[in-house]
Every structure is written in C-alpha cells, then in structure tokens.
C-alpha cells in the first residue's frame, strides 16, 4: 500500500503525546509543528487516527505543497494539481484557510484563490464544475499558509474529533474531550487502570473527565459513535477497509467490558450539571459503569468497594466560576484535606489556570505540565497522596540546599522584573516554537551571575563561579535572593528547582557524579525524546545551545551514514535516527554517557543494529588505521576544549589538535559528505591551512536560537566539505 503524509492537529501543548499516540496507529513522525504533527503512513493508519485518536482535532491528508509568495503563484500552484482525484464529479467542497504572509494577508482572500484554482483545474480538464458548499460539503480542502509555502490537504475527519457525540449539553466551564484525554495520559491513568486502580473526579461538571477515563480504560474508540467522517465521499475512500476498522472497534468495545471494570465516579456540588453529566453518560453508552452524584467536596467520603489505588483528577473552577481569591484558596485547601484523608495511596491530578493555589493543597507536587485550556494558559499538577508528601509550613532545606532569603528587596525586584520580561520574550518564543527546554536567563544582570534553564516545567540554575575579588558572603546573599525569586516568578515547586555552581570543566570533572539521586526524566525536542538528569552531574545530558545544530542534522540525515564523535549522551544521534539516517556510529570514552546514549536511542525506537554506540577514545579511534576504511556521509564532532582523562591515549587541547582531528574526519567523509565541527572554546581560532585544503564555512550565527543569542561565543560551528564536492 502507498504511503501518505498527514498533518494531524491537536490542542496546543499536546503535540508530543499525539506523536506517541499516532505511532501506535502506524503513523511515523516526520516533524512537529505548533498545535499539530506531520506524520507518514498508509491510508489505513489515517483512518485509525480518525476513529481512535483521543487527542487529535483533525486528520488532514496532504495533497501537495505549492509556492505561494504571491496570490498569482498560489493560484498557479493550485490549478496545476489533479483535483478530480480528490473531489467527486459534480460534487461539493469547501476550503478552510489558515495563515498569512506579506502577499496574502486575509484568509478569506486566500481561500477564494484556492477555490478559484480548484474550480478552474476541474473545468479545464473537461469535468463538471464542482459547487462550493460552506456547510456539509462532500469534501473539505485544508489550506495552511506558512511564509511562502501553502500546504493543501483533504480533511479526512470532516469535523473536530474532540466532538465524540456524547456531549451536546455543557456545564458551566466545559473541558474539551481531547484535552481531557491528554490530562488522563499525562496523569498516568492507563497504567493506573491496568494495575487495578479506580477513577474519581471531585468537581466533575458535565462529566467529561470521568467519561473519557472510562472510554480509555474500556478500550472504546472515541469516534465509535460518529455517524459521518470527511472521507466518505472522497474519491480515494476505501469503504471495505473502513468497514473492517469499524467492526474491529465494535469488537474491542465489547471485549473491553469483560472482566474487571474500574470504578468511575464523578461528584459536583451543582445538581444541574450532574443532570447534564447523566445525559452525557447515557449518550456515551456508559450507563451503569460511570456514576455521578451531587455532593460538595466537604461531604466526600470514600466508597467501601474502591481500590486502594487510583486516580483522582479534577479541574477546579477558576476565573469565571469563582471570583474571590480567598474562596478559591479555601476550595483548594479543602480538596487537599479531603484527598489526604480519604484517598491515601492514590494519585491526585489538578488541572488549573491558577497554579499559584496549588500550595494550598498542602501536598508536594512531583510533576507539573504546562498546557492550555483553549487560549488560557494552565497547568496540570500531579501529586502522590502519601503522608510523607505533605507540605509543612516551614520545610527545612535538604543538606547543601540554598535557603531562600531576600536581603535586598530592591535588588531582588530587579531580578523579578527581568525574569518576567524574559518570560514574555524568550518564553513566548519558546512556546510558539514548541520548545520545552530553553535558557531563560544567562547572567543578564551582573548582580546575579546565573544561567537559568527550563526543562519542561523544571528549573536548572547554574551559578557561575565568582572571581576571588567578589565577597563570598555577598555572593551567597544574592544566590539566596535568586532562590527566593525564581520559584515565585516561574511558579514551580521548590523540589523542581535545582541549583549548582558552574565551573570550568577539566580532565574528568564533567564525568564525575555530583549526587546519586538517579532522578532521570524525559524531555522532548523537535520530535525526539531525550533523557535528562538535573541533579547528579555538572551537566544535564542535553546541551541546549546546540539545539539548532541537532535539528539541522535531523532535517538532513535521511538516508545518510552518520558519525557522532565525542557523542556525550547521543542527542545528535537521536535526531539523525529520527531524521531517517540509514545507520550511525556514536563514540564516547565515558561508560556513563555511552549507556545514556543507548537509552536515548531506545526511547526513540532506533534499531540498535543500525545505530551503534561504543565506548572509545575518539583520538585513538581516529588515529587507528583499522577504522580508516569506514566512510560516513555526515559527521558531527563537538570535542571538549581540554581533556587529560586517564582513559585517553593522550591529552586533548582543541586549539592545538583541531586541525589534525578535522583532517582525520575528512579522511572518513564521503566525497559529497559534510563534517559539522563545533567547539565552545571562546578564544578559538581555526587553522587557516584548513581553508586551503577544504571548503570551510562558518555557520555559528545560524546555530544560535533566540535563547542563546545574548551569548554569541557560547560555541562556534563550521561546515566543512571536500573541495569541488
């Protein structure tokens, strides 16, 4: 069967979850985009996404990408396509148009040009003129303009897939069904249900969370009750294939109700929304399985037949439903007290647009996810309901932890204002680019010589080593102030903030453990999952400044043989593998980082037979004649500035040794290949002899994203090719 490219849209902040879900349907990630993902697979997988995706809004089958730097160019690209393959003879269609550029600033104008192109294309082929139907068309054509390119596709879903068909009435503050599903996945509900856990929502409203929890646990397709999809009159539709998928969904829905069924309960103090929830449950076919009661939190008690483990997930009112902040704080306090009394051993998830009230729950959050409820920023706070996780009014600092304290309020206000400003600029840029790990602050103010990095809701603070001329007591004072201000502005729990002193790394220091917590967690970068550890080493496992270099590698790796020297945790190799590299070899002398790199590749389902990681001294490997016959199309070399590790055959000085290293790499580079050479030695000067031997181009400026442009010397980077290649 032929492969297709699909663009699948979703709520903002759900992209990585969606990519994982679509992979289960046989759709492989091509690239991430804001509020959606590009994937590749067979039509059957696209049908599965329409029927089974709990997270998607729309599934769009890509027809073509055309140039659209002007209205005429857009029209020419559209009219040149074979639209008879996508719009039935004499049928109807409509166009949805998103985006703008300098030439096309109005979406209605853009949509009209696309309509004109489609109609003229079909008429020019001698076929009957199709009609334009704003409502209930046979086919919906999706047009998405991004700068000078227009992506055209067929909307297979036909409607937003968040509409499952069971919710026609709404509570006061409805939560969209696919966002509810995302919250359940982030909270770990599938694993909890599989292990015998139950589900409760203490402020259930119209019942969206509890219904979605039941559909998920019982393996019921979210699109099962939909009567019509956007592909049913599309000429490329395969009715027999679709029928078989519908029959499979019915079989799985029946089988899902066999055996043990978790308990599903929803409570709300408002009897009117409980009545709405009961109707939604009936329409979803979950009567007798999902139960709801009109009961305020203060009167909640655990049922005798509930499991010892489970998930209580709720979306407390905020903003519109309760205007008084004191009342809201009291509500959160009551929620925390009730859960701690009645549901020990359970997990609590609170989805809120007012995360500052999370502290009122009286529990320590172990994870926070930043999401959006419509256009409103919100957070999902997760808690393990255990006595040891209770937050006391004055928790003592752990050994070595900096106790927050403000000695100079005026100075602290300056830092507070700078962080807020950076959140509006760099933070907003990162959100638009769908970047979850970035540098927010880099010694912007001389009083606070810190680097502050965000790792998807956690904060990594590195204090630059102060010169001897700086008073040690004053430096400690300023650091304590920063530790007070940072969690306040960034709205993170103290346990999600890590502070280290950053020093020049010599010899084996970067490989030495600073702690032994073993607290690894996964972050995401341009479609890649990567393991990081904020506490145990001087570095975290991910050099954020090299993000554009890694993404460039991903975009240019398809079909290439990739070599990663001094590979660290293999993040660049992961990008190469995700980008379609035919094979790769990654070398590092650290056993720790070799294992870490292997874990990263496994996280992304890379074939270990094709993507090999070896513990090796890169200097010795490059000098070894036995490896000289290995050829690569793309090589990435990012060596340390200096290393005298006992495991190395010699001492590495990058300024002294780089020319030989480059020549040895070029000896292993295919005739039309590329070496990416990078280092972070601030005083580095490239050997001029290399420019006469090879085609050398410095690309440093293009390898710095917005969050590192304040520090242009953080690394330098060159593209090196064979001459006349």
UniProtKB/Swiss-Prot annotation:
It comes from the Bacteria. It is an enzyme of class 2 (transferase). GO terms for molecular function: 23S rRNA (guanine(2445)-N(2))-methyltransferase activity; RNA binding; rRNA (guanine-N7-)-methyltransferase activity. Transmembrane segments: none annotated. Its EC number is 2.1.1.173, 2.1.1.264. SUPFAM superfamilies: S-adenosyl-L-methionine-dependent methyltransferases. One of its GO terms (cellular component) is cytoplasm. It is found in: Cytoplasm. InterPro entries: 23SrRNA_methyltr_KL, DNA_methylase_N6_adenine_CS, RlmKL-like_Mtase, RlmL_1st, SAM-dep_methyl-trfase, SAM-dependent_MTases_sf, THUMP_dom. Keywords: Cytoplasm, Methyltransferase, RNA-binding, rRNA processing, S-adenosyl-L-methionine, Transferase. It catalyses: guanosine(2445) in 23S rRNA + S-adenosyl-L-methionine = N(2)-methylguanosine(2445) in 23S rRNA + S-adenosyl-L-homocysteine + H(+); guanosine(2069) in 23S rRNA + S-adenosyl-L-methionine = N(2)-methylguanosine(2069) in 23S rRNA + S-adenosyl-L-homocysteine + H(+). HAMAP family: 23SrRNA_methyltr_KL. Belongs to the methyltransferase superfamily. RlmKL family. Specifically methylates the guanine in position 2445 (m2G2445) and the guanine in position 2069 (m7G2069) of 23S rRNA. PANTHER family: RIBOSOMAL RNA LARGE SUBUNIT METHYLTRANSFERASE K/L (PTHR47313), RIBOSOMAL RNA LARGE SUBUNIT METHYLTRANSFERASE K_L (PTHR47313:SF1). This is Ribosomal RNA large subunit methyltransferase K/L. It comes from Marinobacter nauticus (strain ATCC 700491 / DSM 11845 / VT8) (Marinobacter aquaeolei). The lineage of its organism: Bacteria, Pseudomonadati, Pseudomonadota, Gammaproteobacteria, Pseudomonadales. The gene is rlmL.
């Amino acid at each position: 069967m032929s492969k297709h490219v699909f663009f699948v849209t979703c709520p903002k902040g759900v992209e990585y979850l969606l990519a994982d879900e679509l992979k289960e349907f046989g759709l492989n990630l091509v690239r991430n985009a804001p509020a959606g993902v590009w994937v590749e697979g067979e039509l059957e997988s696209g049908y599965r996404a329409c029927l089974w995706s709990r997270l998607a809004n729309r599934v769009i089958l890509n027809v073509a990408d055309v140039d659209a730097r002007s209205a005429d160019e857009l029209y020419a690209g559209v009219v040149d396509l074979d639209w008879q393959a996508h719009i039935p003879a004499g049928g109807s269609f409509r166009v949805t148009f998103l985006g703008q550029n300098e030439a096309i600033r109005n979406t209605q104008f853009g949509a009209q040009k696309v309509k004109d192109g489609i109609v003229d294309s079909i008429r020019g082929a001698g076929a009957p003129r199709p009609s334009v139907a704003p409502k209930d068309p046979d086919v919906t054509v999706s047009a998405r303009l991004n700068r000078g390119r227009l992506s055209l596709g067929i909307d297979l879903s036909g409607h937003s897939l968040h509409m499952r068909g069971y919710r026609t009435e709404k509570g006061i503050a409805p939560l969209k069904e696919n966002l509810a599903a995302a919250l359940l996945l982030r909270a770990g509900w599938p694993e909890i249900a599989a292990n015998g856990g139950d589900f409760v929502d203490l402020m259930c409203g119209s019942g969206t969370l509890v219904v979605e929890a039941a559909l998920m646990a019982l393996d019921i397709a979210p699109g099962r009750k939909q009567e019509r999809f956007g592909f049913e009159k599309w000429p490329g539709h395969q009715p027999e294939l679709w029928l078989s998928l519908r029959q499979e969904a019915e079989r799985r829905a029946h089988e899902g109700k066999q055996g043990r069924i978790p308990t599903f309960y929803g409570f709300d103090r408002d009897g009117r929304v409980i009545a709405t929830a009961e109707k939604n449950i009936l329409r979803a076919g979950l009567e007798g399985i999902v139960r709801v009661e009109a009961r305020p939190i203060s009167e909640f008690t655990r049922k005798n037949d509930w499991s010892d483990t489970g998930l209580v997930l709720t979306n407390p009112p905020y903003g519109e439903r309760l205007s008084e902040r004191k009342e809201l704080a009291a509500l959160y306090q009551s929620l925390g007290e009730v859960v701690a009394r009645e549901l020990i051993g359970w997990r609590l998830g609170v989805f809120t647009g007012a995360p500052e009230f999370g502290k009122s729950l009286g529990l320590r959050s172990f994870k926070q996810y930043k999401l959006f409820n419509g256009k409103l920023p919100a957070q999902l706070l997760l808690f393990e309901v255990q006595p040891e996780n209770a937050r006391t009014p004055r928790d003592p600092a752990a050994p070595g932890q900096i106790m927050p304290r403000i000695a100079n309020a005026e100075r602290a206000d300056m830092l507070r204002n700078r962080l807020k400003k950076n959140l509006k600029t760099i933070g907003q840029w990162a959100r638009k680019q769908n970047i979850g790990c970035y540098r927010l602050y880099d010694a912007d103010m001389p009083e606070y010589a810190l680097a502050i990095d965000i790792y998807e809701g956690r904060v990594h603070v590195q204090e630059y080593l102060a010169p001897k001329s700086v008073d040690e007591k004053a430096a400690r004072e300023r650091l304590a102030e920063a530790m007070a201000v940072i969690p306040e502005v960034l709205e993170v729990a103290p346990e999600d903030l890590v502070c280290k002193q950053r020093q020049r790394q010599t010899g084996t220091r970067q490989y030495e453990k600073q702690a032994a917590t073993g607290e690894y967690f996964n972050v995401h970068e341009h479609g890649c999952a990567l393991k990081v550890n904020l506490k145990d080493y001087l570095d975290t496992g991910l050099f954020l400044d090299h993000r554009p270099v890694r993404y460039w590698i991903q975009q240019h790796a398809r079909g290439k043989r990739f070599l990663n020297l001094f590979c660290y945790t293999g993040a660049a190799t992961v990008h190469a593998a995700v980008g379609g590299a035919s094979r790769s070899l990654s070398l590092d002398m650290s056993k720790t980082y070799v294992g870490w790199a292997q874990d990263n590749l496994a996280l992304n389902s890379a074939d270990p037979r094709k993507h090999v990681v070896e513990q090796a001294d890169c200097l010795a490997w490059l000098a070894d004649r036995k490896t000289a016959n290995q050829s690569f199309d793309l090589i990435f070399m990012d060596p340390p500035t200096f290393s005298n590790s006992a495991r190395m055959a010699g001492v590495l000085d990058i300024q002294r040794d780089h020319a030989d290293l480059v020549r040895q790499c070029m000896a292993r580079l295919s005739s039309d290949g590329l070496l990416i050479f990078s280092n972070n030695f601030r005083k580095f000067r490239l050997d001029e002899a290399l420019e006469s031997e090879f085609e050398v181009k410095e690309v440093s400026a293009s390898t710095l994203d917005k969050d590192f442009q304040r520090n242009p010397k953080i690394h330098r980077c060159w593209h090196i090719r064979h001459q006349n290649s």
